[in-house]
Regions:
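Core subunits and conserved enzymes of cellular information-processing
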Residues: 2-214
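Positively charged, small/polar-rich N-terminal and surface patches that mediate targeting and assembly
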Residues: 4, 54, 125-127, 151-155, ...
């Protein structure tokens, strides 16, 4: 089940399309909802909000310099592929922030409802971060520190690592902005960490599938040739009938599981199917320990 050069190219293109779209979603949330309200949930963009408030330096200029330094750390500790994809994300975000500052300047918040702005300032970057983490990239900045922390410590959750690395930035907001903004920022940081973990869990969700059938060949062929996944089978017997059957075990993504279910139904195969949701799958085609 070797992957062809064309398929590898499509995977790379697809990955960078996802990275670009994710960064665009994040930039919209940061520029239109986070910066105008001085929300500081941590990260380089949070630091940029502090710097823009205290100095003449623009948010995009500070983001560029800080991201370059942290990108070097990512290359050293997280690898070349991570650094290249995160570098692309950093370039896209910096360019988009600069374009927004030039062509869509903001003098204040978009609405007079801070809670509404907080929802968008939280949801858009958090969802974008989860999408980036899922394809092995990040938006740069303190996300890099969080991933290094997770890799070299016993932390299991990305959200927990993000919370720890960004907490200092939120505490700084208490001294730079008013207490009202600082409290919003602390709530925002907590919710952001929870949202990132929740979205990542849903995106990593797979189906561990157990199939009892009379004919293993069509099902195994479909899994291996159409879905390009592995499967394991063993002979078994029904307890009530004492008739011989085959038991097939495979692990698929949610979309692939639906395809397999539709195939079995379409071919009218005599099969009993049990699906169990799982988020931790290690091995070829999935995560690597």
């Amino acid at each position: 089940m070797e992957i062809s050069t064309r398929e590898k190219t499509l995977q790379i293109v697809s990955r960078y399309v996802i990275i670009t779209l994710s960064i665009s979603i994040m930039t919209i949330g940061v520029y239109f909802f986070k910066f105008p309200n001085n929300f500081v949930f941590g990260g380089v963009t949070g630091g940029a909000a502090l710097v823009a408030k205290l100095t003449p330096l623009s948010a995009s200029a500070f983001s560029s310099g800080a991201n370059i330094l942290l990108l070097i750390l990512g290359w050293i500790f997280l690898g070349r592929d991570f650094a290249i994809s995160t570098g692309w994300a950093t370039v896209v975000m910096t360019a988009e922030l600069a374009l927004f500052e030039k062509y869509v300047p903001l003098s204040g918040p978009l609405s007079d409802q801070p809670m509404l702005d907080l929802v968008f300032a939280l949801a858009l970057p958090a969802i974008a971060s989860a999408l980036l983490f899922n394809v092995g990239a990040s938006s740069g900045g303190t996300d890099v520190i969080a991933l290094i922390l997770k890799k070299y410590t016993h932390m299991q959750n990305t959200g927990e690592a993000l919370f720890i690395t960004d907490l200092a930035m939120v505490l700084a907001a208490c001294f730079v902005f008013d207490l009202y903004t600082a409290l919003y920022s602390f709530v925002g940081l907590t919710v952001k960490s929870l949202v990132v973990d929740a979205v990542l869990e849903q995106m990593k969700m797979c189906k561990a599938i157990l199939i009892i059938c009379d004919d293993k060949d069509p099902i195994c062929d479909f899994v291996m040739r159409k879905l390009v996944r592995g499967a394991t089978y063993t002979p078994c017997y029904g307890a009530y009938t004492d008739r011989p059957h085959y038991m097939i075990y495979t692990t698929l993504t949610h979309r692939e599981a639906l395809q397999l279910q539709a195939f079995i139904h379409k071919e009218n195969l005599n099969a009993f199917i049990s699906m169990l949701s799982t988020t931790e799958v290690f091995g070829k085609g999935f995560n690597h320990a």
